[in-house]
A protein has these predicted regions:
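Histidine-rich, glycine-flanked metal-binding segment
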Residues: 1-5, 11-56, 71
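Di-metal (Zn2+ and/or Mg2+/Mn2+) metal-binding site signature of metallo-dependent hydrolases
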Residues: 52-76
Length: 140
């Protein structure tokens, strides 16, 4: 028996093949089978008829560094299919935070978010602090 089944979806698999109807069967956290057969047993089953099933998307240039400090679930990314996000590479990241520019940097970063970051209570100023905060509070 499979752990999970996603049945009757339109599969877009990233291989440049045309989308096709299929059922995915998952065992031990991995896709074990992709088939047109939707009759196989699974502990949990989802009907994906009328929906697209695809691998998760990678966001290679985002500005979500600080978002994860205030909204760790970040549902918007998940709803859009993003399952991996690279942060901190654009030059406007708040991490690492130069102590001399802390107030100005946080004011600038806050201008892009509904949350205003207080320089006195900002939870992370270096990579270790950021990683520790993310580890403690988690992300989706």
């Amino acid at each position: 028996m499979f752990d999970c089944a996603i049945k009757n979806g339109t599969l877009v698999d990233g291989s440049r093949k045309k989308p096709y109807k299929a059922s995915l069967y998952i065992k031990d956290g991995r896709i074990a089978e992709i088939t047109a057969d939707d009759s196989k047993a699974a502990r949990t089953s989802f009907d994906a008829a009328g929906r697209v099933v695809s691998p998760g998307f990678i966001d290679m240039h985002s500005h979500s560094d600080c978002s994860y400090l205030t909204v760790p679930t970040h549902e918007g990314k998940l709803v859009g299919g993003v399952t991996f996000e690279l942060v901190g590479q654009c030059g406007t990241s708040a991490i690492p935070l130069n102590p001399r520019n802390k107030a100005d940097t946080l004011r600038y970063v806050s201008s892009n978010f509904s949350t205003k970051f207080d320089p006195e209570t900002f939870p992370a100023t270096d990579f270790d602090g950021y990683a520790s905060h993310i580890e403690q509070f988690g992300v989706s």
